[in-house]
């Protein structure tokens, strides 16, 4: 049952990120200071690590994406 809940949460999160990438991101233009972009990072993190750890990694990444942080490459950890 827990596995089914994880899959459902993963699907919902990935759907939300995909909607953002398709419908909202084109209006805002490139804003992220990192490579890959925060939405791509979140999609990859949730796909690789599941909704809980991947979601936490995504939140940490989003908290670092601001003008006072230096730009650069920040891949999803293994």
UniProtKB/Swiss-Prot annotation:
Record's subcellular location: Cell inner membrane
Keywords annotated in UniProt: Cell inner membrane, Cell membrane, Membrane
Lipid bilayer topology: Peripheral membrane protein
UniProt keyword Cell inner membrane, yes or no: yes
Domain of life from the UniProt record: Bacteria
GO cellular component terms, A-Z: plasma membrane
Role this protein plays: Could be involved in insertion of integral membrane proteins into the membrane.
Homology family: Belongs to the UPF0161 family.
Protein name according to UniProt: Putative membrane protein insertion efficiency factor
Species classification: Bacteria, Bacillati, Cyanobacteriota, Cyanophyceae, Synechococcales
């Amino acid at each position: 049952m827990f596995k089914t809940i994880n899959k459902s949460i993963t699907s919902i999160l990935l759907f939300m990120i995909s909607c953002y990438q398709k419908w909202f991101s084109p209006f805002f233009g490139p804003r992220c200071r990192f490579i890959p972009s925060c939405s791509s990072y979140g999609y990859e993190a949730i796909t690789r690590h599941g909704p809980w750890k991947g979601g936490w990694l995504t939140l940490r990444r989003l908290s670092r994406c601001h003008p006072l942080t230096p730009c650069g490459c920040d891949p999803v950890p293994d």
